[in-house]
């Protein structure tokens, strides 16, 4: 989520000055998204999207699944990181927000690598499992409605190959997960997933305090 970080503004500016590789096309999409109602709260921070691209290269991912497209900034970053023959399936409940990012995918020359699925994510994931079978993806990125996180995680774990990676965004959720008084459904859902991940022996995990928290879960072989 945009600007959701524990770093001071000065330290964030410094980190970006020495490590962020956001070109003009990405910046244009980032700025356009920030102008949307709720856009700054919903869009991924650029350094986190860059990190996802690095993960794709580190894992050697050729088949990537993204649950939650929004305006497609992270989609673009991940598509650019794919090797020859790679492909990303990204799904969203509506074509309203992905429609903003699609022209940027075209301008970047990666639109042919992106398979956008519109509709309920639970149904899309079921269709992918039926069509492609379990273990069809090398990396899955989860960044959708928090109420569905438990279901998305279980589906992602089935769809990712042994040794593959599931990356889950917003696992610190504006700090509300650490507030016992925060009992809204979204916070409870994220907190419940975090508890499950801690004890899940099917995966190796690390929760990184990048942006709003991103948990990496490697499916054990």
Curated annotation (Swiss-Prot):
It comes from the Bacteria. GO terms for biological process: antibiotic biosynthetic process; methylation. It holds the Pfam family Methyltransf_3. A divalent metal cation binds at residues 143, 169-170. Gene3D superfamilies: Vaccinia Virus protein VP39 (3.40.50.150). S-adenosyl-L-methionine binds at residues 44, 66, 68-69, 74, 92-93, 121, 145. Keywords: Antibiotic biosynthesis, Metal-binding, Methyltransferase, S-adenosyl-L-methionine, Transferase. GO terms for molecular function: metal ion binding; O-methyltransferase activity; S-adenosylmethionine-dependent methyltransferase activity. Its EC number is 2.1.1.-. Belongs to the class I-like SAM-binding methyltransferase superfamily. Cation-dependent O-methyltransferase family. PANTHER family: CAFFEOYL-COA O-METHYLTRANSFERASE 3-RELATED, O-METHYLTRANSFERASE-RELATED. 4-O-methyltransferase for the lactone ring of midecamycin and other macrolide antibiotics. This is O-methyltransferase MdmC. It comes from Streptomyces mycarofaciens.
């Amino acid at each position: 989520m945009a600007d959701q970080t524990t770093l001071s503004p000065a330290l964030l500016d410094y980190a970006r000055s020495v490590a962020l590789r956001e070109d003009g096309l990405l910046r244009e999409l980032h700025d356009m998204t920030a102008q949307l109602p709720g856009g700054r709260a919903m869009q991924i921070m650029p350094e986190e999207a860059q990190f996802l691209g690095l993960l794709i290269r580190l894992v050697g991912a050729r088949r990537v699944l993204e649950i939650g497209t929004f305006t497609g900034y992270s989609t673009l970053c991940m598509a650019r990181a794919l090797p020859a023959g790679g492909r990303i399936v990204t799904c969203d409940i509506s074509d309203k927000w992905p429609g903003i990012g699609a022209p940027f995918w075209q301008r970047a020359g990666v639109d042919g690598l992106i398979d956008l699925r519109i509709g309920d994510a639970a149904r899309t994931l079921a269709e992918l499992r039926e069509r492609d079978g379990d273990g069809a993806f090398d990396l899955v990125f989860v960044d959708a409605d928090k109420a569905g996180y438990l279901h998305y995680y279980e589906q992602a774990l089935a769809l990712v190959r042994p040794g593959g990676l599931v990356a889950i965004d917003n696992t610190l959720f504006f700090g509300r997960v650490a507030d016992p008084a925060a009992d809204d459904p979204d916070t409870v859902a994220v907190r419940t997933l975090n508890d499950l991940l801690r004890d899940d022996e099917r995966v190796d995990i690390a929760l990184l305090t990048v942006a709003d928290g991103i948990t990496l879960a490697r499916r054990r072989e």
